[in-house]
Swiss-Prot record:
Residues 41-54 have a biased composition (Polar residues). One of the primary rRNA binding proteins, this protein initially binds near the 5'-end of the 23S rRNA. It is important during the early stages of 50S assembly. It makes multiple contacts with different domains of the 23S rRNA in the assembled 50S subunit and ribosome. Forms part of the polypeptide exit tunnel. Disulfide bonds: none annotated. GO terms for cellular component: ribonucleoprotein complex; ribosome. InterPro entries: Ribosomal_uL4 (IPR002136), Ribosomal_uL4-like (IPR013005), Ribosomal_uL4_dom_sf (IPR023574). This is Large ribosomal subunit protein uL4.
Length: 211
């Protein structure tokens, strides 16, 4: 179990919150998270790269010159892979790069990643709920009050981010805002600082705490 300090929008301490999640064994945790990240990145690949083999390249049906008597190397087609404009040997073809991983393993990897970064987590009550209009400066100032620089990699996880909040954050290149149900291993490990809304923390505990 980990205890986190809860702060308000002004950065003042308002209480404490706990997070109790089962994690992987120390001997297998690194491999588990690594496989989860590889799977996540593999699933983002379109897999549409495609090349033409010598049989698919247009032309090349006629033998370019006779077999003997020219002093040159024998050629059967101008579309041989040995010539410019020829086919590609063992080039990529459209395929799926998806990797399989059990649901229990995926959930365990996410819990392990979150608990591994618990020292970098800042829990905030009512993050950005007072914003009436999109204002990037308000987000930068709020992060500053929490001791977090907006030009570092920051992951903000909220229960249900409002449109005003999304528009306020989108101008910050290194700040990413996601909902609690979009939590993933890569973002957890990639960020330098994590900001969790109090309601998001409760959602995470409810969804992942029973395993």
């Amino acid at each position: 179990m980990a205890n986190c300090v809860v702060r308000d929008w002004q950065g003042k301490e308002t209480g404490k919150a706990s997070l109790d999640l089962k994690v992987a064994k120390e001997t297998t945790a690194l491999d588990l998270m690594h496989r989860a990240v590889l799977r996540q990145q593999a699933h983002t690949r379109q897999g549409t790269a495609s090349t033409l083999t010598r049989s698919e390249v247009r032309g090349g049906g006629r033998k370019p010159y006779k077999q003997k008597g020219t002093g040159r190397a024998r050629q059967g087609s101008i579309r041989t892979p040995l010539r410019p404009g020829g086919g590609i040997v063992f080039g990529p073809k459209p395929r799926s790069y998806n990797l399989a991983m059990n649901r229990k393993e995926r959930r365990l990897a996410l819990r392990t990643a979150l608990m591994a970064r618990i020292d970098d987590v800042t829990v905030v009550k009512d993050f950005g709920t007072s914003l009436e209009a999109p204002k990037t400066r308000e987000i930068v100032d709020a992060l500053g009050r929490l001791g977090i620089e907006a030009d570092s990699k920051v992951l903000i996880v909220l229960g249900t981010p409002s449109e005003v909040l999304r528009r306020s954050v989108r101008n910050l290149e290194k700040v990413k805002l996601i909902a609690a149900n979009q939590l993933n291993v890569f973002d957890l490990l990639h960020a330098n600082a994590l900001v969790l809304g109090e309601e998001a923390l409760a959602t995470i505990q409810e969804v992942y705490g029973d395993d």
